[in-house]
């Protein structure tokens, strides 16, 4: 059964303007305590009071030992997150990851081996697969896009248009795929968009307002819709 929610309130990881210059995205991953809170929410959403089918069909003392394999070519992202789902829901499970994030895994590659109580592992399986598929899907698509500009000096930048609650895992996966991290939230930089420009009447006035009211070293960017705006 899922572990009880801890009363401990971990400190949430806050964003910083000083992002790493390398493409090591590990700073984007949640702390272990924060990840466990996320897992508890995922399990509560999926399992509810119990995994009714598994508890009916699988004997209480049954054991399971299986490999998690990929069905298509994918860029791995979130392998340790997926493994932690099993470890958290089934503490007695033995979980061994067989591949690292960032690797292009060919169809049929074994990603993880899991052994332990059958009921618990079956209950945890879909949650683990869902988060792994979500993260690998992002990394795989981004890798495809990034490969298109490998021969140029252009950089692929991510956004904050993410599924609520999944931002850091999404941005981590985008970076694994080849993106550069942009703002982690509304708090860590000024980005002037069409609505802001409309209020002030021009980019020049909007930028002047931003410069007047933000600390000197705060990064200010303008999202342009036309070449004329770029020139301004």
Give the ranges of each region predicted by the language model.
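Acidic/glycine-rich phosphate/pyrophosphate-binding loops and surrounding catalytic core
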Residues: 2-232
């Amino acid at each position: 059964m899922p572990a009880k929610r801890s009363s401990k309130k971990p400190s949430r990881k806050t964003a910083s303007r000083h992002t790493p210059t390398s493409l090591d995205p590990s700073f984007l991953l949640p702390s272990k305590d924060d990840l466990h809170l996320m897992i508890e929410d995922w399990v509560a959403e999926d399992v509810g009071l119990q995994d009714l089918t598994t508890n009916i069909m699988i004997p209480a003392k049954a054991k399971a030992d299986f490999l998690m394999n990929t069905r298509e070519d994918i860029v791995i992202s979130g392998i340790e997150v997926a493994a932690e789902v099993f470890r958290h829901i089934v503490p007695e499970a033995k979980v061994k990851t067989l591949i690292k994030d960032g690797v292009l895994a060919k169809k049929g590659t074994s990603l993880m081996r899991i052994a332990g109580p059958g009921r618990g592992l079956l209950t945890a399986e879909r949650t683990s697969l869902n988060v792994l598929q979500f993260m690998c899907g992002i990394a795989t698509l981004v890798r495809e896009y990034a490969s298109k500009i490998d021969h140029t000096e252009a950089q692929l930048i991510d956004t904050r248009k993410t599924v609520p609650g999944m931002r850091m895992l999404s941005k981590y996966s985008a970076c694994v795929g080849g993106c550069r991290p942009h703002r982690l939230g509304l708090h860590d930089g000024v980005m002037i968009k069409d609505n802001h420009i409309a209020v002030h009447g021009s980019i020049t006035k909007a930028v002047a307002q931003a410069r007047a009211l933000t600390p000197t070293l705060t990064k200010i960017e303008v999202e342009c819709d036309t070449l004329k705006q770029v020139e301004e």
